């Protein structure tokens, strides 16, 4: 873990691999705190999820959480815009906005087009959500959820498309 953290650069976020809901997450600001927080996260992961596997990612101090909703099938992928999920409490989303109030039109077009291209390249079919951390004008890929998320009605209201039906 120490070598990974040095490579990524502090601060880092230790997360439960099987986690969710902010459980099993620890922010490590400096190396001398790593061992204790790593063990604590491991115990919490086992307790909450029955799996003590962890992963480490860069921690962003003032991030925006941007999600791109996609639908893909029959050799065609389309985006249904983005959602800004940055208003959170304990790593749980409270408010979803679409379109994101912090992106310029150029940034929006860029991330939407790059997301469609990525989904096409991996050959994914179905509804999905590609998540990014956005900070200081840069996007960092977080994950892709290959299912319809609870937030999908925000996109449905904005686009008029019934994602589940489609």
Q: Where are the model-predicted features located?
A:
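ATP-dependent carboxylate activation and anion-phosphoryl transfer catalytic cores
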Residues: 8, 16, 21, 28-166
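N-terminal cofactor/phosphate-binding cores enriched in small/glycine residues
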Residues: 13
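Gly/Ser/Thr-enriched, mixed-charge loops and adjacent short helices
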Residues: 3-7
